[in-house]
């Protein structure tokens, strides 16, 4: 078994019973793959597939001019490399993007050429087509300096859908069937039955029309329409009555209206008897071909074809006419013998199309098309060309209508065709096939579709959404180019004169900047990032709206299994509309979600893994992942629990075709991080998975002692840790960078064999939490590719660590944990367990105003030196300064308009030369309620503006850092080269060299060490080949130095050129403040099982309940929070955490008494290999075992995977191992060792009963009381009512509302009430008066008229009612 560098240091003991057959796929794959297919940047132009940008270009080009003599063709496109890297874009507020250039060809044809067109001229040119934002390696985009995520959209797949209204439309409760053809782009086509069973169609939800109008419009005659939808009965007219062709199936179940006889005249069915199977057999036995029917049997039947008089050519009766006595007489007159009628019955062959034809008043194709034109364009005159153009554009034009590959596949599958490809527009037979299926549904054959089935909903990913926007931009460009192409020849234009890239840029910018699906990335912790990128939303353009979405769409559907998580979804109005991809889910080429299954052949489970979509899955019998399997892979049980088409049943093993890959297959990343999820109620699990995303990264992350084994995958895939790109040896490491000398076999020839990782230090995330990376390797460590080198935010030794492991006791404590409150020990705060660092970014810009430029300076009048004390000579705060609310961070003055001066002032000015009052102080100050330490300052200066000292110093520091990286690389490169050189030179014969090396001397190591390395190149060797080698090495070193110098120059140029700033901005300064937040009452905390609460009190450690060995509890929770919420998982987690810590203490005690390594090995083997998944401890050296044991002192980490976790029996085994009888007795534990006798910290008395105690991974959430509370005495007031504003952002007051007024009224506190409603609210004069009185020390209140009363009076007057106040 292979362990990575970090896994060896701390192995997580897994209780999984099942072996891993399929690794969890890369969690960000959907985003990254989708965008790379959109760009196809690393594919040669000739080999690009028709998708993404390539598809957009080929769909719009070639563009042909109106006269047809000029056309613009698309050749290929290329993307340039971005000007700034990701970090620079974030600092400067730029978009991380790449310029798109398309090579286009302008072809001009000769107008004079008499026959076929001749090419006169071809011009080819690269044209700039706008900027395309690039995806970062972690699946996000940097737009205007902030990281954003494009969320995937779950929408209705294009294709054809059949449904009914569930009897809701008509009062009778009759089911009205309908069908809808949805294209990817273009007009929707609906077909629907009305309560009278007439079939209508409508285009784009406009007015409905009989469907036969559409059939006529596509060129069918009434006869053809009837022939398509009905079978015919053939009659031969006799002198009396008629003969009807005998078709057995059509008679079964009918009631005979007359005696039915065979050829001899023997009665087989008597009149008024129902015809049954025996009668039919008798008729068939009698070889009946025709049945004689009386005349009235024909009446009321409908003719299937036009009946024409053979002699005169006159139409006697039209198709779809009813046969009456008059019609029969006419037919006999014209001596017509054979007629065909429509066969209909009430059961399974309704006359729907026939009745629709009767309603339809149009005569022929033209009339039908005109009717459609009038419905689409009411009020416009229908000219022949316009009618034709509109009809063709509706469904037959490739520009306006696109079914897409998916739509065509879904359509063909639904109408029962074998091939899944075909034209992308609608065809006549598509419309016919749809109507046929709809009529069959009405006839009672077939099933309607389930729109919530994941086979009918598909996912649109980033790539596809961006492509649609890009195409929309290109189509706008196409219109403009068409206009100008006519002048291309006469004005001798080049392609770049024709194409204006603005529409494309604006479409792309609008999509990435303000689309509903482009969201500000949730970056609170690594899990929230990864979940945000795996989110699937049903909202957004072309999707549902919150208000209109019903219960069915939001509900969990059987097809969600393994594709979409049934647990993780927001609470509130979006519930069920926003989902998360399941752990193993994957998109197929059509955008449908697939999930992996293991193939089962003859009741034997194989290792073959197939990805099945929701539709394919419905055809198979699938066993669950926990089905018992023997060693050879056979299914053991007689009956196996399995699913088929969404139904669960027990079947015999021979019927099983597939089996789940893993028990955690059905849940998302967040839900799979909850241990004992199977013991939690679903509602609480939902809260648990949502709250893990809000956990604030702690200062010292701590791995959860009870995890699920997926923590490592999440940490690595989120990109928050640093992974080794290539294996090698750690050459240098400090807090900010790691240098690795790459293994020879992994280094590419001619490339630097050095990897340098600059770590992210104290950087602000989107949510103002702190992102900081810490190295976990030492110099000299050997690392392999993919090993974790540094931990990021919320990771510990390469595992996700969202909170801290707390010693928890479940017991009430003086009412301080009433209603989910949390009681916490002061020790937790003192040890900084939940202390987090938050980084605030404060900006100030100096603009060019009408009155002159604003200036960033230290020279500000009317400010005491104390206030300027933290600023440097440029007026910018020092790094490391500790600042509080109101302190100046950046000094800035703004010119103020010239005021009219009195002659006296003018004189004073002239004497003292005072200019100070021309400017006002607009410095950047620390906002109220904030204090912290300045950790970074960035200064950006516009091109052509003089840089101040501070800006120059920042650039110099950055260059120094970069030079350090280059020197490290050079040092290692040269070191390697000189080592190779020494091996080559030793033992060679020299012709001469430095330090008077004699000719013919053999070079030895001592001689080389005595020389400076660079002088080695001066040695003249006798062997020509060796001399050539020496020269080659010298050249390669010089080449490398030259390359590094160039790179340094490039960097310097980039840093010293002016910055791109918004118009009118001369200088911008960003100051970053680090704010330390300790845990305090009012902060929200939660476990992973939806058990949330608010800290109510922080209790001195000496008052907390403690155990017999003096160890106090960290957190006291209310036991009443468990039974009604049904999240029992937290109790099991506490028990297992107790065992984990107990084992850790035992290992610590063994290390303390310096046990033999062998004894350690035995104990560790007992822990790891007695149950659950076995670990290969044999392969560990003694040193590695020792390091492992040292890392386990704080607790042996356990993994209890979702739905495959630790059993009760395994947990008691671990508790027995952790707490042998002597320890258990000392702590006065119960027999099952999960409850302990606790003592009251205040009295020292033992509590009456033993208490459940153990360790739980507890999180501090991003709802911090510091961000929510604020205080105000005076501040801004509303303009109209003069009442204080509300809310923290406005620095507002607390609303004293209607009910609070009632409370004071009820209490009779009249003065308090008067004060509340006047001087403390909106009595303007009263407010100032109170302030004045307070200053004078005279505590009197004069309440006046509240301003809002005046507003009321004015409003009443505006209604025309005169209202006046009598003042006495």
Swiss-Prot record:
Catalytic activity: RNA(n) + a ribonucleoside 5'-triphosphate = RNA(n+1) + diphosphate
GO cellular component: DNA-directed RNA polymerase complex
Pfam families to which the protein is assigned, alphabetical: RNA_pol_Rpb2_1, RNA_pol_Rpb2_2, RNA_pol_Rpb2_3, RNA_pol_Rpb2_45, RNA_pol_Rpb2_6, RNA_pol_Rpb2_7
This protein's UniProt keywords: DNA-directed RNA polymerase, Nucleotidyltransferase, Transcription, Transferase
PROSITE patterns named in the record: RNA_POL_BETA (PS01166)
GO biological process terms, semicolon-separated: DNA-templated transcription
Class of this enzyme: transferase
EC number in record: 2.7.7.6
Molecular function GO labels: DNA binding; DNA-directed RNA polymerase activity; ribonucleoside binding
Cystine pairs: none
SUPFAM superfamilies, alphabetized: beta and beta-prime subunits of DNA dependent RNA-polymerase (SSF64484)
PANTHER family according to UniProt: DNA-DIRECTED RNA POLYMERASE I SUBUNIT 2
Entry function: DNA-dependent RNA polymerase catalyzes the transcription of DNA into RNA using the four ribonucleoside triphosphates as substrates.
Quaternary assembly: The RNAP catalytic core consists of 2 alpha, 1 beta, 1 beta' and 1 omega subunit. When a sigma factor is associated with the core the holoenzyme is formed, which can initiate transcription.
HAMAP family: RNApol_bact_RpoB (MF_01321)
Protein family membership: Belongs to the RNA polymerase beta chain family.
Name of the protein in its database record: DNA-directed RNA polymerase subunit beta
Annotated source species: Burkholderia thailandensis (strain ATCC 700388 / DSM 13276 / CCUG 48851 / CIP 106301 / E264)
């Amino acid at each position: 078994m292979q362990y990575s560098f970090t896994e060896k240091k701390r192995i997580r003991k897994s209780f999984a019973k099942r072996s891993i057959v399929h690794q969890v796929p890369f969690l960000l794959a959907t985003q990254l793959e989708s965008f790379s297919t959109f760009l196809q940047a690393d594919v040669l132009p000739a080999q690009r597939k028709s998708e993404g940008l390539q598809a957009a270009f080929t769909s719009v080009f070639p563009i042909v001019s109106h006269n047809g003599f000029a056309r613009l063709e698309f050749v290929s496109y290329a993307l340039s490399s971005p000007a700034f890297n990701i970090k620079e874009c974030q600092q400067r507020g730029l978009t991380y993007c790449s310029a798109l250039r398309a090579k286009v060809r302008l072809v001009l044809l000769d107008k004079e050429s008499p026959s076929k067109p001749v090419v006169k001229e071809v011009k080819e040119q690269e044209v700039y087509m706008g900027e395309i934002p690039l995806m970062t390696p972690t699946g996000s985009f940097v737009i205007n300096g902030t990281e954003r995520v494009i969320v995937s959209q779950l929408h209705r797949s294009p294709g054809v859908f059949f449904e009914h209204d569930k009897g809701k439309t008509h009062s009778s409760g009759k089911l009205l069937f309908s069908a809808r053809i949805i294209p990817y782009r273009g007009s929707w086509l609906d077909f629907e039955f009305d309560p009278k069973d007439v079939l209508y169609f409508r285009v784009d939800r406009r007015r409905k029309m009989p469907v036969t109008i559409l059939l006529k419009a596509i060129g069918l005659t009434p006869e053809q329409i009837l022939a398509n939808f009905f079978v015919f009965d053939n009659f031969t007219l006799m002198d009396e009555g008629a003969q009807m062709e005998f078709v057995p199936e059509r008679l079964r179940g009918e009631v005979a209206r007359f005696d039915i006889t065979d050829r001899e005249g023997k009665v087989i069915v008597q009149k008024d008897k129902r015809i049954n199977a025996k009668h039919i057999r008798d008729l068939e036995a009698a070889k009946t071909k025709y049945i004689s029917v009386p005349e009235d049997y024909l009446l009321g039947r409908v003719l299937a074809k036009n009946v024409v008089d053979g002699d005169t050519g006159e139409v006697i009766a039209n198709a779809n006419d009813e046969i009456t006595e008059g019609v029969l007489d006419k037919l006999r007159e014209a001596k017509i013998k054979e007629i065909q009628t429509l066969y209909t019955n009430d059961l399974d062959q309704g006359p729907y199309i026939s009745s629709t034809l009767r309603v339809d008043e149009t005569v022929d194709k033209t009339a039908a098309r005109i009717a459609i034109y009038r419905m689409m364009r009411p009020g416009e005159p229908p000219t022949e060309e316009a009618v034709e153009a509109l009809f063709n554009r509706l469904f037959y034009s490739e520009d306006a209508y696109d079914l897409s590959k998916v739509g065509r596949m879904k359509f063909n599958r639904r109408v029962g065709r074998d091939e899944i490809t075909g034209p992308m527009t609608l065809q006549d037979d598509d419309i016919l096939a749809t109507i046929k299926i709809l009529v069959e549904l009405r006839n009672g054959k077939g099933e309607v579709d389930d729109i919530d089935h994941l086979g009918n909903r598909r996912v649109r990913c980033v790539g596809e959404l961006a492509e649609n926007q890009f195409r929309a931009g290109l189509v706008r460009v196409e219109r403009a180019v068409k206009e100008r192409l006519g002048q291309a020849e006469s004005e001798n234009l080049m392609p770049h004169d024709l194409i204006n890239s603005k529409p494309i840029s604006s479409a792309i910018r609008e999509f990435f900047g303000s689309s509903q699906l482009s969201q500000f990335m949730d970056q609170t912790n690594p899990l929230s990032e990864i979940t945000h990128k795996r989110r699937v939303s049903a909202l957004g353009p072309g999707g549902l709206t919150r208000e209109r979405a019903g219960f069915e769409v939001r509900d969990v559907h059987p097809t969600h299994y393994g594709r979409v998580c049934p647990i993780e979804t927001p609470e509130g109005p979006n519930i069920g509309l926003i989902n998360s991809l399941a752990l193993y889910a994957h998109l197929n080429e059509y955008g449908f979600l697939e999930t992996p299954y293991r193939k089962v052949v003859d009741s034997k489970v194989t290792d073959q893994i197939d990805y099945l979509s929701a539709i394919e899955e419905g055809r198979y019998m699938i066993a669950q992942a926990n089905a018992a399997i023997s060693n050879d892979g056979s299914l053991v049980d007689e009956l196996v629990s399995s699913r088929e088409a969404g139904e669960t049943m027990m079947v015999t093993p021979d019927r099983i075709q597939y089996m789940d890959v893993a028990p955690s297959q059905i849940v998302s990343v967040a839900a799979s991080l909850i241990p004992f999820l199977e013991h939690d109620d679903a509602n609480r699990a939902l809260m648990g998975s949502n709250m893990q995303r809000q956990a604030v990264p702690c200062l010292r992350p701590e791995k959860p002692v009870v995890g699920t084994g997926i923590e490592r995958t999440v940490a690595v895939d989120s990109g928050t840790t640093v992974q080794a790109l290539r294996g090698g040896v750690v050459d240098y490491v400090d807090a900010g960078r790691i240098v690795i000398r790459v293994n020879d076999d992994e280094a590419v020839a001619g490339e630097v064999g050095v990897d340098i990782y600059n770590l992210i230090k104290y950087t602000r995330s989107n949510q103002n939490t702190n992102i900081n990376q810490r190295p976990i390797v030492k110099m000299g460590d050997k690392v392999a590719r993919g090993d974790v080198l540094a931990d990021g935010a919320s990771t510990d030794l390469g595992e996700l660590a969202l909170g801290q492991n707390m010693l928890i006791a479940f017991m009430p404590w003086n009412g301080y944990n009433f209603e989910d409150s949390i009681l916490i020990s002061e020790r937790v705060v003192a040890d900084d367990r939940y202390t987090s660092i938050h980084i605030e970014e404060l900006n100030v810009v100096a603009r060019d105003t009408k009155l002159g430029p604003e200036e960033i300076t230290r020279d500000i009048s009317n400010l005491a030196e104390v206030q300027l004390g933290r600023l440097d000579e440029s007026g910018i705060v020092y790094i490391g300064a500790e600042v509080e609310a109101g302190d100046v961070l950046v000094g800035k003055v703004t010119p103020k308009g010239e005021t009219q001066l009195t002659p006296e002032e003018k004189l004073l000015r002239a004497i003292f030369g005072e200019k100070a009052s021309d400017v006002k102080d607009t410095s950047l100050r620390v906002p109220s309620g904030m204090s912290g330490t300045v950790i970074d300052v960035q200064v950006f200066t516009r091109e052509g503006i003089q840089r101040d000292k501070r800006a120059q110093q920042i650039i110099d520091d950055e260059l120094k850092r970069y030079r350090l990286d280059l020197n490290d690389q050079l040092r290692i490169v040269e070191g390697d080269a000189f080592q190779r050189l020494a091996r080559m030179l030793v033992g060679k014969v020299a012709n001469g060299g430095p330090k008077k090396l004699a000719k013919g001397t053999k070079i030895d190591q001592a001689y080389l060490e005595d020389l400076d390395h660079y002088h080695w190149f001066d040695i003249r060797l006798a062997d020509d080949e060796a001399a050539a080698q020496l020269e080659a090495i010298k050249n390669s070193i010089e080449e490398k130095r030259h390359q590094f110098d160039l790179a340094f120059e490039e960097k310097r140029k980039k840093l010293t050129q002016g910055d791109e700033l918004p118009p009118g901005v001369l200088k911008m300064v960003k100051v970053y403040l680090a704010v330390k937040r300790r845990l305090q009452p009012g902060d929200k905390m939660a476990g992973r099982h939806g058990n949330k609460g608010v800290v109510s009190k922080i209790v001195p450690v000496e008052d907390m309940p403690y155990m017999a060995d003096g160890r106090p509890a960290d957190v006291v929770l209310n036991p009443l929070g468990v039974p009604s919420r049904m999240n029992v998982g937290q109790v099991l987690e506490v028990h297992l955490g107790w065992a984990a810590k107990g084992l850790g203490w035992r290992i610590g005690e063994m290390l303390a008494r310096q046990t033999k390594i062998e004894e350690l090995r035995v104990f560790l083997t007992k822990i790891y290999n007695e149950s659950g998944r076995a670990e290969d401890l044999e392969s560990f050296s003694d040193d590695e075992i020792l390091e492992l044991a040292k890392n386990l002192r704080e607790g042996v980490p356990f993994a209890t995977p979702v739905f495959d976790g630790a059993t009760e029996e395994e947990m008691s085994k671990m508790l027995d191992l952790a707490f042998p009888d002597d320890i258990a007795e000392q702590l006065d534990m119960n027999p099952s060792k999960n409850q302990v006798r606790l003592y009251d910290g205040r009295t020292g008395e033992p509590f009456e009963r033993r208490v459940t105690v153990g360790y739980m991974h507890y999180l501090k959430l991003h709802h911090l009381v510091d961000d929510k509370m604020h205080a105000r005495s005076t501040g801004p007031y509303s303009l109209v009512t003069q009442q204080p504003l509300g809310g923290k952002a406005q620095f507002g007051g607390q609303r004293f509302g209607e009910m609070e007024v009632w409370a004071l009224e009820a209490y009779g506190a009249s003065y308090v009430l008067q004060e509340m409603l006047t001087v403390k609210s909106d009595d303007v004069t009263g407010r100032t008066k109170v302030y004045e009185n307070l200053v004078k020390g005279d505590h009197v209140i004069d309440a006046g008229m509240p301003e809002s009363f005046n507003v009321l009076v004015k409003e009443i007057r505006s209604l025309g009612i005169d209202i006046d106040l009598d003042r006495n």
